[in-house]
């Protein structure tokens, strides 16, 4: 591949001890960390290929402890996509997910209302798009210690409007999916943001004599219309005084 790789900045958030570092190191270094060593801030980079397209992931592993709440705002400002982690064997970590999600929304809304700084992800992803978030129920290997059901995880993800997966950093189950699906959302948002748009429904013509015309509807779906077919739109009037 020639040229510079697309960089995606992902931030891993969640309570202390839920396996944020274990997931990150399993993704980037392909091994499982057995011991728990509280993290303040660690950054990892890895070149990956997602859907036959190479890119660079920058993954920020963050502290889950309450005393680092002030630092978390800056981590969120710098992030493009987020991996929200709880442990299926910890009801309290699951209960705190909404607090992390609220903080993400608050910080991103604040960023959207202020000028973006150089290099800010705000400049590359439309601020009107939802923040890409993956909810991860980690430690799915701890079957006998489960305190949070899979159904509860799905229900919370629907409530928060984000994706959901259960994973095991120890057994390397759904680790790549947890991160790669966030990248896929970011790519879709960038593609949609780069499409030329007009007031109302966005349309791109491929027509000409004897050809069809394609367009994008307001819900993002692609449609088509053959020559001679009418569409409901008001004629454009130009008055020269």
UniProtKB/Swiss-Prot annotation:
Annotated Gene Ontology cellular components are:
plasma membrane
- What's an example of a GO molecular-function annotation for this chain? GTP binding
Q: Which residues carry this modification: Cysteine methyl ester?
A: 238
Biological processes annotated in GO: signal transduction
What is the documented disruption phenotype for this protein? Displays slight reduction in conidiation, but normal growth, appressorium formation, and plant infection.
Where would I look for the motif Effector region in this sequence?
A: 36-44
Domain of life (superkingdom)? Eukaryota
Biased composition range(s): Basic and acidic residues: 219-230
Compartments, record wording: Cell membrane
Residues holding GTP? 17-22, 33-39, 63-64, 138-141, 168-170
Listed A to Z, the keywords are: Cell membrane, GTP-binding, Lipoprotein, Membrane, Methylation, Nucleotide-binding, Prenylation
Q: How does it sit in the membrane?
A: Lipid-anchor
Q: Looking at the keywords, is Nucleotide-binding present?
A: yes
Q: Which residues form the propeptide?
A: 239-241
Lipid linkage positions (S-farnesyl cysteine): 238
Activity regulation note: Alternates between an inactive form bound to GDP and an active form bound to GTP. Activated by a guanine nucleotide-exchange factor (GEF) and inactivated by a GTPase-activating protein (GAP).
The cross-references to InterPro entries, in alphabetical order and at most eight, read: P-loop_NTPase (IPR027417), Small_GTP-bd (IPR005225), Small_GTPase (IPR001806), Small_GTPase_Ras-type (IPR020849)
Which stretches are tagged as biased composition: Polar residues? 191-205
Which parts of the sequence are annotated with region: Disordered? 190-241
Q: How does it assemble?
A: Interacts with farnesyltransferase beta subunit RAM1.
**Function (record text):** Modulates the activity of the adenylate cyclase catalytic subunit and therefore affects the biosynthesis of cyclic-AMP. Plays a role in both surface attachment and surface recognition of appressoria, a highly specialized infection structure for plant penetration. Regulates appressorium formation by coordinated regulation of cAMP signaling and Pmk1 MAPK pathways.
Q: Which family does it belong to?
A: Belongs to the small GTPase superfamily. Ras family.
Quote the protein name from its UniProt record. Answer: Ras-like protein 1
> Which source organism does the UniProt entry give?
Pyricularia oryzae (strain 70-15 / ATCC MYA-4617 / FGSC 8958)
Q: Which gene encodes it?
A: RAS1
